[in-house]
Amino acid sequence: MGEKRQARQGADVLLQEEPLRFQTRKQVGLLGGNFNPVHLAHLVMADQVQNQLGLDKVYLMPTYLPPHVDEKKTISSEHRLAMLELAVADNPCLDIEPIELIRKGKSYTYDTMKALKEANPDTDYYFIIGGDMVEYLPKWHRIDDLLHLVQFVGIRRPNYPTESTYPIIWVDVPQMAISSTLIRQKVKSGCSTRYLLPENVINYIQEKGLYQDELDNKL
């Protein structure tokens, strides 16, 4: 009788442990940027990486203040976050990661990824960068430690080499000659931005009167 009870108890333990043993890790992409404002090239890049690599999601991660940017020259994080939320609303595979806006201060990728990995130990992160940024990786803050926290994904760019001493997954994404600078200039001059960014983001910019001041257009 005692042996049967022990057998049942052992089976119960196995049943409880089974889900943990067979858990699959989440595969998540991160696309960082100022998103001032977010535009279709950002969204196409995030969507293509998610689809081509089969990631669970790609999070657009707005910076509060990049290490190389003057705090006075960027639009408020409240507006940038609101536009991002509008931009990804119709795509369940895209989302927002606001960790750097919450933390505030200068944003070093290593610090951000360390915090994310500690908060989400079951997640593998894929950090998306443009091919033009790969050559600057040696200058990134604590790059050797960062390599233990993320897998870099490089977006191929014309006239930029794909050779690197760092492990990078390369992805082809349609090239779109759209930039936040271009959009801000068009808004400032009263030109149409249709087909450059989502319609709901265009409406938000108009409703809030964004990018009309010279200060708003410096980044």
Curated annotation (Swiss-Prot):
Q: Return one GO MF term.
A: ATP binding
Q: Name one GO biological process term.
A: NAD biosynthetic process
Give the enzyme's EC designation: 2.7.7.18
**Alphabetical keyword list:** ATP-binding, NAD, Nucleotide-binding, Nucleotidyltransferase, Pyridine nucleotide biosynthesis, Transferase
Report which reactions are catalysed by this protein. nicotinate beta-D-ribonucleotide + ATP + H(+) = deamido-NAD(+) + diphosphate
Q: In which pathway does it act?
A: Cofactor biosynthesis; NAD(+) biosynthesis; deamido-NAD(+) from nicotinate D-ribonucleotide: step 1/1
Superkingdom:
Bacteria
Cross-referenced InterPro entries: Cyt_trans-like, NadD/NMNAT, Rossmann-like_a/b/a_fold
Q: Which Pfam families match?
A: CTP_transf_like
Record function comment: Catalyzes the reversible adenylation of nicotinate mononucleotide (NaMN) to nicotinic acid adenine dinucleotide (NaAD).
Instruction: Please give the family membership noted in the entry.
Output: Belongs to the NadD family.
> What is the protein name for this chain?
Probable nicotinate-nucleotide adenylyltransferase
